[in-house]
Amino acid sequence: MMIKQYLQVTKPGIIFGNLISVVGGFLLASKGVIDYPLFLATLFGVSLVVASGCVFNNYIDRDIDRIMERTKNRVLVKGLIDPKVSLIYASILGIAGMLLLYVGANPLAMWLAVIGFVIYVGVYSLYMKRKSVYGTLIGSLSGAAPPVIGYCAVTGQFDMGALILLLIFSLWQMPHSYAIAIFRFKDYQAANIPVLPVIKGISVTKNHITLYILAFMVATLMLTLSGYAGYKYLVVAAAVSVWWLGMALRGYKATNDSVWARKLFVFSIIAITSLSVMMSVDFNVPSSAGLLTYVG
């Protein structure tokens, strides 16, 4: 029973979601030549670091998790794991993950994990989430770290491809997170968390969602235009972005914002999964390096 609780506190769903993006970044950089020991070290290393961040987040958020309907049954809220033990557990997971990335991948992969971890736990969870409407923006940087780690584990350098991945996944996080904040509006309001819908209103949030999806659309296309992904990826990226944008625009006429936001949220997961899969398999670019100058 205790094993189940120690697993739950790491938020397995979040770990799995992040692993899909790690695979996308890793295989994009591998170009069909897969180093399997490196692949496994990267997957397990990132999994451990993400798990650590989630446990620390659960520890930090115990007070607000009690208030929110969605989180009131979390392991630490119900006292199923001693808070002090959870801190030790989180520390062990984090150190193990970072060591694995350092030894099994490369120092750059480890440092990117450290930066993502510090932003998520230190900047976002401890401060920005509770104090600023810009918390979501800061948190998006840590959410974009896994695919960049996967990519840099292979390349050993932070090039234009890594930067484009950072942009794609950071920009994706914003509409994804704002959608959650809309359909969980009452929870965030009750817990006094200053997310955009609560502070500025849902109408303003819809404008932000639309703008971020437009920016996301441009960023996704850059992966092909800069010579990193193929044209099959480009077609899927364009189709997914246009559909997501259409869903966002329909939000202006929505009679039930909660239902609309939930649909937008669900599609955001489909969208990013589709892109991760396509960049994994469509890494060959026909003849020329791309429509824009290749940097790598």
Curated annotation (Swiss-Prot):
UniProt keyword annotation of Zinc-finger present: no
Gene name tied to this protein: cyoE
Annotated localization: Cell inner membrane
Gene Ontology molecular function, alphabetical: protoheme IX farnesyltransferase activity
Transmembrane segments: 14-34, 36-56, 75-95, 99-119, 133-153, 163-183, 209-229, 234-254, 265-285
Miscellaneous section: Carbon 2 of the heme B porphyrin ring is defined according to the Fischer nomenclature.
EC number: 2.5.1.141
Reaction(s) catalysed (UniProt annotation): heme b + (2E,6E)-farnesyl diphosphate + H2O = Fe(II)-heme o + diphosphate
Its job: Converts heme B (protoheme IX) to heme O by substitution of the vinyl group on carbon 2 of heme B porphyrin ring with a hydroxyethyl farnesyl side group.
Family: Belongs to the UbiA prenyltransferase family. Protoheme IX farnesyltransferase subfamily.
HAMAP family to which the protein is assigned, alphabetical: CyoE_CtaB (MF_00154)
Pathway(s) where this gene product acts: Porphyrin-containing compound metabolism; heme O biosynthesis; heme O from protoheme: step 1/1
Disulphides: none
Membrane topology qualifier: Multi-pass membrane protein
InterPro entries in alphabetical order: Protohaem_IX_farnesylTrfase, UbiA_prenyltransferase, UbiA_prenylTrfase_CS, UbiA_sf
Keyword Membrane on entry: yes
Protein name, entry field: Protoheme IX farnesyltransferase
Gene Ontology CC terms: plasma membrane
Keywords: Cell inner membrane, Cell membrane, Heme biosynthesis, Membrane, Transferase, Transmembrane, Transmembrane helix
